[in-house]
A protein has these predicted regions:
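Solvent-exposed edge beta-strands and adjacent loop segments
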Residues: 2-70, 112-135
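Hydrophobic transmembrane signal anchors and adjacent membrane-proximal interface regions, especially
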Residues: 9, 56-58, 91-93, 142, ...
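A short, polar/proline- and glycine-enriched secondary-structure boundary/capping micro-motif
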Residues: 21-26, 75, 148-149
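Compositionally biased, intrinsically disordered low-complexity segments enriched
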Residues: 31, 39, 97-98, 148
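Residues within well-ordered beta-strands of beta-sheet-rich folds
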Residues: 63-65, 98-100, 137-139
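Short, cysteine-centered beta-strand-loop-beta hairpins and adjacent loop/turn segments enriched
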Residues: 69-74, 144-147
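Short, acidic/charged, Gly/Pro-enriched secondary-structure junctions
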Residues: 74-116, 120
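Short solvent-exposed strand/turn elements
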Residues: 132-146
C-alpha cells in the first residue's frame, strides 16, 4: 500500500457526473473531508438496559484553507479562486454546486469523492505584513460518491 502525499489531494469544482479533471480551487493549502453517520435509537423495554441502534442519516462536509488571492500575477481576476466560488454560489444565487475531493495525479487507482454541496461559511484573515488566508466550509447535500480513476 502506497502512502498518499497530501499535496496530491486537492479540492476542485466538477461536472455533475464527477468525471473529468475539474476546476482546481486555487491556492489551497489544507483540505479535509468528513463523513458522519448518526444511527437512530431503537432502544425499547426488551433491550435489557442497553441502548440499541440501527442505521441512520449520513452527512459529509469539506473544510479548506489556503492563501487568499483574487487576481493572478498579471492582475487578471481568478476564475478558480475562492472569490469566484463565493460570487457564483453565495452572493448572486445561493446555489449548490458539485465539488470533487481527492487525488489529481495521472496515476491510475486515484480515489476521488464528489457530490453536491453548499458553501456554509467563508472567511478571510489579513494580518499586517502577513499572507492573507481564507477558510471555506462546504456541507454536502445528498450522496457522496467515490470514484477510482
Amino acid at each position: 500500500m502506497a502512502i498518499l502525499n497530501g499535496t496530491e489531494v486537492k479540492l476542485y469544482t466538477v461536472s455533475n457526473s464527477g468525471v473529468g479533471a475539474g476546476n482546481l480551487v486555487a491556492f489551497a493549502q489544507n483540505c479535509s473531508i468528513s463523513i458522519e453517520h448518526s444511527p437512530r435509537d431503537i432502544t425499547n423495554k426488551e433491550s435489557g438496559g442497553y441502548s440499541e441502534s440501527l442505521e441512520g442519516l449520513r452527512s459529509w462536509s469539506i473544510e479548506m484553507d489556503g492563501a487568499y488571492a483574487y487576481t493572478d500575477a498579471a492582475g487578471t481576476a481568478l476564475t478558480n479562486g475562492a472569490d469566484a466560488l463565493i460570487e457564483d454560489n453565495v452572493l448572486n444565487l445561493r446555489q449548490k454546486f458539485f465539488v470533487g475531493f481527492g487525488g489529481t495525479t495521472t496515476v491510475t487507482s486515484d480515489v476521488r469523492y464528489w457530490g453536491e454541496c453548499y458553501i456554509t461559511s467563508w472567511s478571510v484573515s489579513a494580518g499586517t505584513e502577513d499572507t492573507s488566508t481564507m477558510s471555506i466550509s462546504l456541507t454536502g447535500t445528498g450522496v457522496l460518491t467515490q470514484n477510482v480513476v
